[in-house]
Amino acid sequence: MSNEENEGGFVSHLTELRKRLIHSFIFLIIFFVICYIFAEHIYGFLVDPFAQAVKDDGSDRRLIFTALQETFLTYIKVSFFTAFFVTCPFILMQIWKFIAPGLYKHEKVAILPYLILTPVLFFLGGMLVYYLIMPLAIKFFLSFESTGMSTSLPIQLEAKVNEYLSLVMKLIFAFGISFQLPIVLS
């Protein structure tokens, strides 16, 4: 093989990689715009565990923002997080389409279960956080509030929107990644 043929093969691989990355990026941007349109609904969904815990507690709570741009930036963050969460299977499929032509048939068959299980396990980790961990964690942390004694001030939660949603998104991401452990270990 001549040097020019090697360079041609290398350039074609880079071109294919570029095409796959551009498809992934365009898909992510499209879903980001869609998610931004529905950002308030997504925000409501992510805040629901907090709202339910507060309602069960019987206290009058709210989420606050302390900077003028905080709500806007929170909607941007929520939209990007949701778009990334939704497009992850598509991005993995693009990576697969780039890698698959270089694999033998038996290698493709061996990897296929992992490709299917990866997004499923990530989604299950996110569901565990949303439906089980967050409600329990919120109730646990709210139990540390105090009414104050005659000599001390009460400790009361004034949760910031951005901090709460950052916690929820970090936990969803962390549990989604930790649910990948069976794939990594096998």
Label each residue range with its predicted role:
Residues 1-186:
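Membrane topogenic/interface segments and analogous intrinsically disordered interaction regions
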